[in-house]
Amino acid sequence: MPNLVLDPLLKKLQACLESDVAEPFLTVLLDAMAVAMLVDAKCRASIHGFEGRYVFKTPDKKVGATAVFGGSHMSVSHQAIDRPEPNVTVTFRNPKALMELLLSRTPDLIGAMLKQDVNVDGNLNYLYRFAFLARHLQLMATRCA
C-alpha cells in the first residue's frame, strides 16, 4: 500500500542515486530515514533500543547534518551540531564520497579513510550501523521507483 508521506521522499532519494549530483544526498537520505522510522514498523524495529548521535560534515562545514536515534525514533537537524558530544562524527571530502561509502554493498571504511574520502571520530560500529540503515532505505527506494 502506498505511503503518501514516505513514497515521495523515497522517489527523491532514488532520483539522487540515479543522478550525478550528490549535493542533496545527505539531506534527502536523513529526511527519508526519519520518516521511514515513523511510518514503517520494520524500520522502527531495526532501531529499537538503539541510542546514537551522528554528526556528518564537510571539512569547510558547508554541508552538515546531525541524526539522533533514541527511543525507537530518529530526529534530524540539517546542520552539524557538536553538542552534546556525538557518538561518531563523519567528516567527508564531498557528498559523493559519503554516498559511495554508505551505499556500497560492502562498505570499505578503512579504504575510504586511507584515500582520505572520510575521517571518522568516534565508534566505527555506529557508522557501520548507519550504513546498514542507509542500504535498507536504498532498497526501499528501489522498490518504490
Regions found by a protein language model. Name each.
Residues 1-145:
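Feature captures hydrophobic
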